[in-house]
């Protein structure tokens, strides 16, 4: 969801962070024991092309600094989700659990038309169908080919780079801080912490 104003959950967590990064962090980590028990298994995280424009801001995950911009908050959260996917891929590579992230492309969905009306008006004739946007998600979840890799970022069933603009790379220390801050916000702790 793209919010036009900064809002917080009942727990005091910025809504975009809660929905698009903290919830997948918590849910995936809670499911990992079950995924390991039912291996081979897969984690498929749906990111966004918007993440290409932003770096993760571990110093301001809750977007308290500066003027709030819902598109930027969304892109930052989706960048964080790609980072988490890479961490899970590394940590789970030897236990039969693959982790993938992907960008569905720009699809003609109610979310795009209501959250980005100007963008939608300009691009509606070239947007993908929802089915086209979902194709790579289903392929990553079910195909034999996708089971043979892990930690990649996909678009149209092809691995893609996670960085196209300078200044969007994070350091190993920022990865560790991201994981630690999400643990703190979620109340979940891992015995052997994944640290990016």
Each predicted region: which residue ranges?
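Catalytic loop of short-chain dehydrogenase/reductase
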Residues: 1-10, 14-17, 36-97, 103-122
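Alpha/beta-hydrolase superfamily serine-hydrolase fold, recognizing
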Residues: 2-4, 169-173
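Short alpha-helical functional segments enriched in proximate histidine and acidic residues
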Residues: 24, 34, 91, 185
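A short, exposed helix-loop element centered on a Lys and neighboring polar residues
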Residues: 28-29, 86
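C-terminal helical subdomain
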Residues: 77, 123-164, 172-180, 188
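C-terminal helix/juxtamembrane-tail motif
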Residues: 181-196
């Amino acid at each position: 969801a793209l919010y036009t104003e900064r809002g917080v959950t009942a727990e005091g967590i910025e809504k975009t962070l809660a929905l698009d990064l903290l919830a997948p962090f918590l849910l995936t980590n809670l499911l990992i024991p079950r995924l390991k028990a039912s291996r081979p298994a897969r984690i498929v995280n749906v990111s966004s092309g918007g993440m290409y424009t932003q770096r993760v801001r571990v110093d301001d995950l809750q977007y308290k600094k500066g003027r709030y911009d819902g598109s930027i908050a969304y892109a930052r959260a989706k960048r964080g989700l790609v980072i988490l996917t890479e961490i899970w891929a590394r940590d789970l590579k030897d236990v039969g659990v693959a982790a993938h992230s992907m960008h569905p492309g720009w699809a003609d969905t109610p979310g795009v038309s209501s959250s980005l009306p100007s963008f939608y008006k300009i691009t509606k004739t070239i947007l993908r169908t929802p089915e086209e946007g979902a194709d790579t998600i289903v392929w990553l979840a079910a195909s034999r080919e996708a089971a043979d890799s892990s930690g990649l970022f996909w678009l149209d069933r092809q691995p893609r780079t996670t960085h196209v603009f300078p200044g969007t790379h994070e350091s190993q220390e920022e990865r560790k801080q991201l994981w630690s801050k999400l643990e703190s916000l979620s109340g979940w702790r891992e015995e052997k912490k994944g640290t990016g």
